[in-house]
Amino acid sequence: MERIFLIGARASGKTTAGRILAEKLGWRCADTDEMVQRRAGCSIADMVARDGWPVFREAEAGALQAACALTRVVVSTGGGMVLRADNRAALREGGIVFYLCAPAAVLASRLVLDPVVSQRPSLTGGNPAAEIAAVLAERDTLYRETAHHVVDACQPAAAVAGQMLRLLAAAG
């Protein structure tokens, strides 16, 4: 095992739990959204407004490929990473994949508290609670099909990281 990938909806805690997990393993952490923003020189919201979703999705796939070249790394991915079949295959083949799963109501309440919510472009143009419910309904099957393990992301990030550590230990 050289890489661990965290997938799930916005506000599921991928980045925070990923940092904790990486620290406990003595590994690096990477975030594909941060990688895209660094390369683009702007926020994802600005990139999508300027260039559109297809350009962002292509940049996101490039960030995943770059992450797949790293070793001893926990990679937090953007919520839409699973939308492309080639990304799903790269995730499953590239390492252990954890789906951080939480109900839409929990995710919506976290989004309200998120200080970087303005950097997240709307996916549907709807209000955040309705948007997260619709997007989660659309993507849940893809997350589950891609993941090797599903973890309960309703808990604090440290507990989520603990769940992942236990699953890794049990898998040997």
Curated annotation (Swiss-Prot):
Reaction(s) catalysed by this chain's protein: shikimate + ATP = 3-phosphoshikimate + ADP + H(+)
One term under GO cellular component: cytosol
Location in the cell: Cytoplasm
Keywords, in A-Z order: Amino-acid biosynthesis, Aromatic amino acid biosynthesis, ATP-binding, Cytoplasm, Kinase, Nucleotide-binding, Transferase
EC number: 2.7.1.71
A GO term for molecular function: magnesium ion binding
Pfam families: SKI (PF01202)
A Gene Ontology BP annotation from the UniProt entry: aromatic amino acid family biosynthetic process
PANTHER family: SHIKIMATE KINASE, SHIKIMATE KINASE 2
Similarity comment: Belongs to the shikimate kinase family.
Alphabetized HAMAP family for the sequence: Shikimate_kinase
Protein name in the entry: Shikimate kinase
Organism: Oleidesulfovibrio alaskensis (strain ATCC BAA-1058 / DSM 17464 / G20) (Desulfovibrio alaskensis)
